A protein has these predicted regions:
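Catalytic Walker B motif of ABC-type/P-loop ATPase nucleotide-binding domains
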Residues: 172-176
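Conserved ABC ATPase "signature" region
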Residues: 114, 118, 125-143
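A short, surface-exposed alpha-helical micro-motif characterized by mixed small hydrophobic
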Residues: 213-215
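Helical segment within the ABC ATPase nucleotide-binding domain
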Residues: 187-199
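ABC ATPase "signature
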Residues: 231-232
């Protein structure tokens, strides 16, 4: 059952024109406030990055806006549908990539994706046809009939993403989709996500990799201590600086490094010898 709340003033109402509109989202676990009145608008057709330090509230926010966790306060709206008043309609519009530990490892890749489609109410034949297309797109055809437990980390992330896309959602929500993924698999995933956005879809990712967010995303929100401290286009949030440097300024994450007396690299306090320079055109052997 959705939490009972007092009516919001007009200025705090979510924006139904947005792909995702969050107002005053709040969640507490015991004495710890995980999400503290968080508000955010994610435009339709954007590639939106959520960044923040560990424990900032990103994953808790994602879990609430996708209908898997009941908030203690606030509201989340998906393309005009209130997540907790119309949860089934909201979930139909969302593709949430499961974490590797949340899938059935003894199913083959093909079985897993077909199963995900059938859970969404698709006939088996349609789910199988779509699964074949997705597996080919993710370059997993040779592994389609291998159990997922025997997949590499990159292959597992790709098959998890395929299960999120099987029902052709309007919004993809991905928590750390590139974590532990090799460069080849990462490039494959990026290409598919960018193509999806070009068709009008919306992608929301959480990530710790600032360079990836700066390169891929159109928009970014910096989350710290359960609140959004900056949001907008990547250029607006970066404000003329490197995004990682701006992030550190916003969350107060840079601290002076303590000198470790015994960690001297073997130079006994002497400057390191200069690295010999190779003359232009000469190949060092």
């Amino acid at each position: 059952m959705a939490p009972v709340q007092a009516p919001m003033p007009p200025a705090m109402q979510p924006n139904p024109a947005m792909a995702v509109s969050i107002r005053g989202l709040f969640k507490r676990f015991g004495n710890k406030v995980a999400v503290n009145g968080l508000s955010l608008d994610i435009p339709t057709g954007s590639f939106y990055g959520l960044v923040g330090p560990n424990g900032a509230g990103k994953t808790t926010t994602i879990t609430m806006l996708t209908g898997l966790l009941v908030p203690d306060g606030g509201v989340a709206m998906i393309l005009g549908h209130n997540v907790w008043q119309d949860v089934n309609a909201a979930k139909r519009l969302i593709g949430l990539m499961p974490q590797p530990e949340q899938i059935f490892p003894t199913l083959t890749g093909m079985q897993l994706v077909v199963y995900a489609g059938m859970l969404r109410g698709m006939p088996r034949a349609e789910a199988a046809a779509r699964a074949k297309d997705l597996i080919a797109a993710f370059d997993l055809t040779a592994a389609a009939n291998i159990m997922v437990r025997d997949y590499s980390a990159g292959m597992t992330k790709k098959i998890c993403l395929a299960t999120a896309m099987i029902h052709s959602p309007r919004i993809l929500v991905l928590d750390e989709p590139f974590e532990s993924v090799d460069p080849v698999s990462s490039a494959n995933i990026k290409d598919i996500l960018v193509d999806y956005v070009h068709t009008g879809g919306t992608v929301v990712i959480s990530s710790h990799v600032m360079a990836l967010v700066e390169r891929m995303c159109t928009h970014v929100a910096v989350v710290n201590q359960g609140q959004v401290v900056a949001a907008g286009t990547v250029a607006q949030v970066a404000a003329g600086e490197d995004l990682e440097e701006r992030f550190l300024q916003l969350v107060g994450g840079r601290h002076g490094a303590a000198h470790i007396a015994w960690l001297d690299g073997g130079a006994d306090g002497q400057p390191a010898p200069a690295v010999p320079q190779t003359p232009a055109g000469e190949v060092r052997r």
